Structures are given as C-alpha cells and as structure tokens.
C-alpha cells in the first residue's frame, strides 16, 4: 500500500482499466496535473493475461477488433504484433462442419459463403446485405434508427429462425454474454459494423499488451498501483494510503465499485461469462477459426484453438483451446465433464486426454445493454467536480471503455477551462 505525502493535482483518475488509461492519455496531453490510482498491483482492469507454465491465458476469452476507432487512435496496432483469426466462423451442425465467411473482409469467399450449408441462400444473402448496411452507414445513422432488441432486429431483417438459432445466437451470445439477445439493436449494429470492417485477433503477448500500450506514453510515476480508493468527494480522493486534493475526479472503476464510490450512480446489471482453457498435444483443427454450436445445446457458445492464431499462447508443441459459456458455471468436475463432451462433439475428436488448465469465471464480464440505449453515450458529468467513465457509460466493449474515458476527460478539461482536444470516436 503506497503511503501518500500530502498532494494536490488538477485531476485524479480512479481506476487503471482501459477507460481510466484513455482518460489519462487525454488529460496528460492537455498539460494538466493528474494522478491515476489503481487498487490492483497492475493496470488493465478486466483486460489481463496470466502466464502459467508457458501458457498465456487471458482473463476470459477476449479479442481485439482493429475497426474500433479509438484503438488505432491510442496505440500502434503494428507494435502489438497482432495474431489474427479467420474472418468467418465454423458451425457444427450434426455430423458436419459448415463455414460462413465474411465477404467484406475476404471478397474471394463470396461464392463459398453463398453455397455454404448454413441457413438458406436467402438467409445468407439477407445477412450479407445487413452486414454491408452496418459496415457502410455512419454510426450516427445507425444510432438514429428505431431501437429494439438484437433478436427482433435480426428477425426484422428477414433472417430465418434457423439462421438466428444455429449461427447468430451462439455467436452473439458470446459477444454480449446474453443468450436471450435482449441487447439493444444499437449495440448490435455497432458491434456487427466493427466485425464487418475490422480484423479480429489477439496481441502475441496476450490481451494484457493492450492496456500496457495505451499506458505507454504516460509518465510512470503518475500511475499509482496498489492504492485502494476509499471515498471520493468534491475536491478530494481518500485512498488507504492518504488523501489527494484535486479539482476534478474521474471514477473509471468497474461498475460495482463506481456505484459504491458514487451512491447516486445507478448500478448496472452485469452479465457473466465462463471460459475453459484446455491444453492438448495436437490441435483439434488446423485453422484459427471460431467454432459455433449450431446444434443449439447452449452449453458452449463458442470455442477456438488460440494457438492456431497465436503460437505464443502455448508452449512449443502444444495447443491451447478456449471454450466459452454464457453465465457463470462452477469449475467443478461435473461441469468440466459436460464441457469435454460438448467439445468432443463440436470438434469431432476425443478430448479425454486434454488437460484442463484453468476455468475463468467472470460474474461481471460485461454490463448489460438492454433497450433503451439511445446513442450509447450516457451522462458522465455528475456535478461537484465528479465524473464517471467506463464501458457502462458507452457500449459494452473495448471501444466503449476507451471512448468513454476519452470523452469523459474531454468534459473534465472543458470544466477546468483547459484545451479539450478532438472529440471522442
């Protein structure tokens, strides 16, 4: 626990996740005095990677989308040494694996996509049209559209029940941690827009490389880790190591902690995800492609051989398989056995000799984004010099966290009379 000498700064940022780091980048660029305090012994928040006996295990299955506008604005994507997944998915339905590719990312795949054994030809044409619309319309146009649930938006697009249930529900339930697809159609539009326009992958050194890259230009002494914030008030932040006087406070913690520090702030509903990591001597498939369960078992939402995309995630000669389930399952032998059976069915290979490396349970993986969400940008200025940032104030995504932190810092700088810089993307 760092012991603070009496200190006074312009801005205190509470929380060193992506939102807090993005806010720090903007206030630092404006030349105001600031300090970031983080309770954990590292930065990154929910974006973290553990090294275990040569395995690189992210804290839950996470990916980085290169089409998120705030990502290239804050980091050099090339320097992340990205490892990319295939622009499409595989779908297990009965004894066969079917492929559905993203023709916007891989134009040569269009004939294969139209003849794939996933949904009807009409379904595939309608989905291609929907993805093209999301990819080409501006975010403002998409967010001006009438709002409904993600499931209803897919139905209104003319997609069949089978296409929704066998492909889109398993895919999107893993993205939103929402099996019912009650998530706002505005969030759906922005997420599918990014998937259509960008590439999906992970940094070679794990997802933890992202917050490290965001923090890269910041002066290290102003990132105070291992300091738990006890309370915030007008002009004051109290940590377990002392008090910090300030002109403005940005609370950029997880939503539950933010609601504790700011009692007037509604506590959002959170959604959970569970990720099972297995090690194997051989990869069950040879490609870095997300595999979905089209048989509607609703046990494994998706699975992927991480080391097919990023060999750095596994020791030499080994393969790392990630499998994600919606909700929080206890890491018991019974649930492990069920997961093994499902993965054996989906990959079409025995899984008895796979080693269960760990089970990552995230009860608060993502804030729920049910209707209504409007333009996704919730109020961040709370009065009395108090501000709040995080993906719960924007879209539930890496983009949402970064954009919220950047936007909130802009409002803080405006309130202080400092140069706010360009608007958030």
Each model region followed by its residue ranges:
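Mid-domain catalytic core of redox enzymes
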Residues: 2-6, 230-336, 345-346
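Conserved flavin/dinucleotide-binding core of flavoenzymes
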Residues: 4, 311-425
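N-terminal Rossmann-like FAD-binding beta1-loop-alpha1 element of flavoenzymes
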Residues: 9-36
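Glycine-rich active-site loop/strand segments that organize a redox cofactor
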Residues: 48-67, 129-142
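Mobile amphipathic helical/loop "lid" adjacent to a hydrophobic cofactor/ligand pocket
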Residues: 71-72, 76, 81-181, 196-197
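Helical element adjacent to the flavin cofactor pocket in flavoenzyme catalytic cores
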Residues: 188-240, 244-247
